[in-house]
Amino acid sequence: MSRCIRIISLCFVLVACSPLVDVPATSTTSPNIEPVATSTLTPESTGSQPTQGIYEENVHLFDYDAGSPVQITEKAVEQEEGYTVHNISYPSPKGGDVPAYLVIPDGPGPYAGILLMHGSSGSRESLLPLAKDLVQTGAVVMTISGPAARTPNRDWIHFTEQDREEQIQLIMDLRRGVDVLTQEPNVDSDRLGYIGYSYGAAMGGLLAGVEHRIKAYGLMVGDGGLVTHFTEDRKPMGGFETLPAAMQARWLEAMEPIDSIHYVGHAAPSALFFQNAHHDSLVAEPDALAYQAAGSEPKRIEWYDSGHGLPAQAYLDMVSWVAELIGIDSSKFQGPS
């Protein structure tokens, strides 16, 4: 059954799953991905209609004035051994300011640049420890707070038009974050990477389809976006299944055109690394398989015998892979204890 037919039918019968959350070992390489009946896409359907048409019709939504310089406001600087942490903000193309930490190694560089994106319940603080580990490898690292993390209650899902507005804003803010990195005089703009965790991994696939200055996209325990996450046949824990049918239909109409599964197939020539877990209670295995299958080549896929919180080996694998593409020293990465 095609995805568009599934979405229409889901306006009436829907089962949801719990939200993608922020989570601060044995690795096995996935076998060739076979079609899965309950997944959103099979390998054979990747890149076909309606995904291709959705991409072409909506990719412009993430455009912004890339030619204008970024006005960075520095609020505080903290010197630590071998690097400095800059507490900054920069204007969002959709209004307001984007809070961020910019972690810069001591010395002139040139350095690679890495952009980090947190999970749904997180903020720039969540990945600051990872940023401090990554800076040791010879990279300028930036971690931002998404739109929901800038609000007092941090509600990241509303099942209204606000979800669409915030997701578009997030992608623009991340693209503007690339501008911040490339404005740094000690950053080599040809050596840029992205690592996203959970929700950050789901949004990373969307970003990969529109932002090709980044060479390496590391996607840790993600799936194909919010429509995928809340509408495929999963555990009824997300709240979507309790909404009136008309409200479900309005939300699907707003969100389907910007679901990551339609964009990750356009990442090339950027490379993708999908990391997923066999016992993940938040990202169902069929959804992960569909996301992986939809991704363009070149891509790498690894599965871990863990839950949503990946083991230390996954971080080592990720940094080693990123190092090969953007020229950082992975031997200096300590990783989570």
Model-based region annotation:
Residues 63-108:
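N-terminal cap/lid segment of alpha/beta-hydrolase-fold proteins
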Residues 100, 110-119:
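Short beta-strand element of the alpha/beta-hydrolase
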Residues 158-198:
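Gly/Ser-rich "nucleophile elbow"/oxyanion-hole loop immediately N-terminal to the catalytic nucleophile
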Residues 203-253, 303, 313:
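Hydrolase active-site cap/lid region
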Residues 267-268, 273-276:
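Short beta-strand/loop motif that positions the catalytic acidic residue
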Residues 281-287:
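Conserved alpha/beta-hydrolase "acid-adjacent" motif
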Residues 289-337:
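C-terminal catalytic histidine-bearing segment of alpha/beta-hydrolase fold enzymes
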